[in-house]
Amino acid sequence: MEKTMEKIVALAKARGFVYPGSEIYGGLANTWDYGNLGVELKNNVKKAWWTKFIQQNPYNVGVDCAILMNPQTWVASGHLGSFSDPLMDCKECRERFRADKIIEDYATEKNLTLEGSVDAWSHEEMSAYIEKNNIPCPTCGKHNFTDIRQFNLMFKTFQGVTEDAKNTVYLRPETAQGIFVNFKNVQRTSRKKIPFGIGQVGKSFRNEITPGNFTFRTREFEQMELEFFCEPDTDLEWFAYWKQFCIDWLQTLGIKEDEMRVRDHEKEELSFYSKATSDIEFLFPFGWGELWGIADRTDYDLTQHQNVSKEDLSYFDDEKGQRYIPYVIEPSLGADRVTLAFLCAAYDEEEIAEGDVRTVLHFHPAIAPVKIGVLPLSKKLSENAEKIYTDLSKYYNCEFDDRGNIGKRYRRQDEIGTPFCITYDFDSETDGAVTVRDRDTMEQERIKIEDLKAYFEKKFEF
């Protein structure tokens, strides 16, 4: 069975995971809406992150910061000055491209090895490589490009009724800066001592020139970010700790070792303020793609905001009698990307018998959009089956389905990744028990109706 993006996208659209945005108006490029199953899947992924990184973690607390911030925030963070992509236009067809992506795609196609990360190359080095290899335009095939120039990725808008420079604001390109500007507030009100972390889940916006690969790279996206504040001399220990914590989280939820890899950034790739950066990548059907960036950002962010705002963002360690700017370890995860990764990892086609193939999504029960399908064997049994549905839906997202052949109903639940199906049959009327079917093994066992809640509590532990 070949796992392709075409199959996964088709299933996602057909079953209500993801729809094209604004579809009845012809759509809007690179926008996607999460459907009835997609919103449950993504919410479960976010909940699983929040549970392990915030709720169950003694170090960390959460915030939810505004999307619009004082523009000085982006001066301090460097986004207004340097948050940009190297772009060039084809003079023949007038299409615009990222120079680094053209080089990377060409090298992949020709099976060539590049020296270091293209991100670290200068404009001159990129231009020289494109000229030397006579790389053609991906759209028209000609080789006639403009010079490379930088393009800022921030979405600009205006606050209030007047569209002038004084009212200019930006849609945040990351959630992290809201955490940094609230460092003192959170530390004071939570009474946390270093080391501690602040986490946030929220929307961010980047005016990407080459978005694509379904929901992998979009202009509007959701992030799950943690900023972990620590003593300057302990940063590399915490960097290693959080890197392993992130790997464990992914593997616990079903990402296999051979589907992921950790890529440590070379020295020349690192941002000037970073001591270490690692990317956790997932093997999508279209190739390796970054899910999680873990960075040792040193004291850069708090120092920058302290310098621009003139507010003291240092921390006084009363046990050591020292005052310092904390270092920051940042594990930054894309909610849309990791949701897509879980969807790709879960997708499978199994040959049950000759010519009989079932499509199944092997989601971890904690993130499955529907936890339990309640399926009465006959419509005559629907009333009592609905009572089971009503009781269990207080605790889990359940689906009730009494239409059609029971075998076809099982297959539909397999396709949407439902871990367990309850079949209420004619024997249930007399013995007070139901058949519970396991999605992955397709094995069935008889469980007393009164024991179902306790039975599923064990199954859905995370």
UniProtKB/Swiss-Prot annotation:
Substrate binds at residues 98, 174, 221-225, 330-334. ATP binds at residues 206-208, 216-221, 290-291, 334-337. The keyword ATP-binding applies. Transmembrane segments: none annotated. GO terms for molecular function: ATP binding; catalytic activity, acting on a protein; glycine-tRNA ligase activity; protein dimerization activity; transferase activity. One of its GO terms (biological process) is glycyl-tRNA aminoacylation. Signal peptide: none annotated. InterPro entries: aa-tRNA-synt_IIb (IPR002314), aa-tRNA-synth_II (IPR006195), aa-tRNA-synth_II/BPL/LPL (IPR045864), Anticodon-bd (IPR004154), Anticodon-bd_dom_sf (IPR036621), Gly-tRNA_synthase/POLG2 (IPR027031), Gly_tRNA_ligase_bac (IPR022961), GlyRS-like_core (IPR033731). Keywords: Aminoacyl-tRNA synthetase, ATP-binding, Cytoplasm, Ligase, Nucleotide-binding, Protein biosynthesis. It catalyses: tRNA(Gly) + glycine + ATP = glycyl-tRNA(Gly) + AMP + diphosphate. One of its GO terms (cellular component) is cytoplasm. PROSITE patterns: AA_TRNA_LIGASE_II (PS50862). It is found in: Cytoplasm. Its main location: cytoplasm. Its EC number is 6.1.1.14. Catalyzes the attachment of glycine to tRNA(Gly). Homodimer. PANTHER family: DNA POLYMERASE SUBUNIT GAMMA-2, MITOCHONDRIAL (PTHR10745:SF8), GLYCYL-TRNA SYNTHETASE/DNA POLYMERASE SUBUNIT GAMMA-2 (PTHR10745). Belongs to the class-II aminoacyl-tRNA synthetase family. This is Glycine--tRNA ligase. It comes from Lachnoclostridium phytofermentans (strain ATCC 700394 / DSM 18823 / ISDg) (Clostridium phytofermentans). The lineage of its organism: Bacteria, Bacillati, Bacillota, Clostridia, Lachnospirales. The gene is glyQS.
